[in-house]
Amino acid sequence: MSKQPRKQRKYIYEAPLHARRKMMSANLSRELREEYGRRSLPLRKGDKVEILRGDFRGHEGKVEKVDLKRYRVYVEGATIQKVDGTTVYFPLHPSNLRIVDLNLDDEKRIKILERKG
């Protein structure tokens, strides 16, 4: 892997979906960190997150959508009003989020947590 910033940016821009998923990780809360023995996890629809930066700082809500193409996450309650009056989710970068509660509906995800613990 290159050290050159331009090549780093190029990799992020052209990354395949399986690599983008890993890049869409957020830190775990202290309690979850102690429970699972790891620092971060890729975000998933249904996870409860806390917003750490920006206009919605301090807000907690469920992840409604993870957009791998744009590297953005949409959180329930973090919405803005468009000029025409419609309400849309505000796109948030995963680095500005902290996972407070995990969505453990998926068996594979549970196995991942057990494996790393």
From Swiss-Prot:
The keyword Metal-binding does not apply. InterPro entries: KOW (IPR005824), Rib_uL2_dom2 (IPR014722), Ribosomal_uL24_CS (IPR005825), Ribosomal_uL24_euk/arc (IPR005756), Ribosomal_uL24_KOW (IPR041988), Translation_prot_SH3-like_sf (IPR008991). One of its GO terms (biological process) is translation. PROSITE patterns: RIBOSOMAL_L24. Pfam families: KOW (PF00467), Ribosomal_L26 (PF16906). It comes from the Archaea. GO terms for cellular component: large ribosomal subunit. Keywords: Ribonucleoprotein, Ribosomal protein, RNA-binding, rRNA-binding. One of its GO terms (molecular function) is rRNA binding. Part of the 50S ribosomal subunit. One of two assembly initiator proteins, it binds directly to the 5'-end of the 23S rRNA, where it nucleates assembly of the 50S subunit. Belongs to the universal ribosomal protein uL24 family. NCBIfam families: rplX_A_E. This is Large ribosomal subunit protein uL24.
